[in-house]
Amino acid sequence: MRKIIVFDQTIREGMQYRGLMFSYAERLKIMEFQQALGVDISQAGYPPAHESEIRHIKKIYHEASRRNYNIRISGLCRALVKDASRMVETGLEEFNLHTSFTAEMLSRQSVESIFNSLKDTVLFIRSKVEKPSIEVSLLDIGKTDMELLKKCAVFLINNLKINILSLPDTSGLMSPNQVCKRVKIISSLAGKNTQIGIHCHNDLGMATANTIMGILAGASIIEVSALGIGERNGIGDIFITGKNLKDQGFDLNLETEKEDIFREYYEFVDSVCYQKTGIKLLNDNTPFFGNSSMTHVAGTHGIGQFGLAADQEFYLNVLCGKHLVENYLKLHKIGYEKKYLQEIVARIKDKSAEADRCVTKEEVKEIVVESG
């Protein structure tokens, strides 16, 4: 299967989440996790924003080089020469530029003037940096006219010969079928020298699914983050996206098998977020890592063939079935005679219906004794 590049934007997207700021030490720790997990590219910040951003990114880049890390360090800026000049100060070789062709932007600027700005910026970078990798993000694929999107893609791919064309659903309003249609069209224009990236926001809860669909439609770079942290509702989740793609046979350097390190990574980002904003991102309902992913209530699920398995929890209410009750009794080491199992299940259901809640362990013990 195709090789997929993992572009972790936890740092820069995280700094756009509800009052969150990452210190240099926190960025370094995040980069260490990314390296340990096989991330290909880390977006360490936004250099034109402030002198401190340039300083932090430069230090992150040099530290990664000093340690002989494989991870590549990048920064984001507008597709303007003045922004790119600040990026050059960091010493980076990975340049992420963004521009917009939405109706609102075109009410202020012509397509030709935006093209000229893009050309000037790309030529400037190439005059200052030997063999840079240049990515351009077109904001955004959901709000830009399809014919204009194709025209922009052809200009960037054929005329400017950029390395990566990123297709972001910045508004987070697209569904997988819409992403598929647009990414497939643009990917068909890419040729062999320009890779297509996919970057999806989560306003309608579709970010991870849309990112996966972008790959299925022809993209080869996922732009994701730890816990899906990012602007507004965030972006695609790095672990869930990566695991899903690997399970489908795609080739990723991302080591989703290192679940313990991923958990540490997520717990670290969550702790920083909670400390600085009072918001917890890692909770019982977090996919894969949340406790709820290992709980069962309905009888069919109690067979143990669904979900993540590992350390499981069982809750008994009117929806429980024989297999789930069996697993519950085994888990809590409650002895019973198998011939009374059906009666035990019926009594548990009756008790739950009567109380309008799940039954407690003590109540289950009483039911088992009474049934025997």
Question: What are the roles of these predicted feature ranges?
Answer:
Residues 170-289:
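Catalytic alpha/beta core domains of metabolic enzymes, predominantly
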Residues 51-78, 116-131, 180-198, 243-249:
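Alpha-helix-loop-beta-strand connector modules within alpha/beta enzyme cores
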Residues 1-19, 96-107, 127-141, 186-195:
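N-terminal small/glycine-rich loop or linker at the start of catalytic domains
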Residues 14, 34, 95, 136, ...:
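Conserved, mostly hydrophobic/aromatic
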Residues 41-48, 67-152:
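Active-site beta->alpha loop and helix N-cap motifs at the rims of alpha/beta catalytic domains
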Residues 39-63, 97-110, 139-141, 166-177, ...:
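Glycine-rich, proline-tolerant flexible connector loops at the mouths of alpha/beta enzymes
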Residues 3-4, 10, 251-372:
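A mid-to-C-terminal "edge-of-domain" accessory segment
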